[in-house]
UniProtKB/Swiss-Prot annotation:
GO terms for biological process: protein refolding. Gene3D superfamilies: GroEL-like equatorial domain. This is Chaperonin HSP60, mitochondrial. It comes from the Eukaryota.
Length: 40
C-alpha cells in the first residue's frame, strides 16, 4: 500500500526488490537492439 511505512532491514529488503524489478524492466532498453518499455 502507498501509506505503509517500513524501517530498518525490512525497508531495505523491500527497496532492493523494487530496484531489481526496475532494473530488469529497463535493461532490455540498453544495447544496440534496445526495445521500448512501458512502466505503469
Amino acid at each position: 500500500a502507498a501509506k505503509d511505512i517500513k524501517f530498518g532491514v525490512e525497508a531495505r529488503g523491500l527497496m532492493l526488490q523494487g530496484v531489481e524489478q526496475l532494473a530488469d524492466a529497463v535493461k532490455v532498453t540498453m544495447g544496440p537492439k534496445g526495445r521500448n518499455v512501458v512502466i505503469e
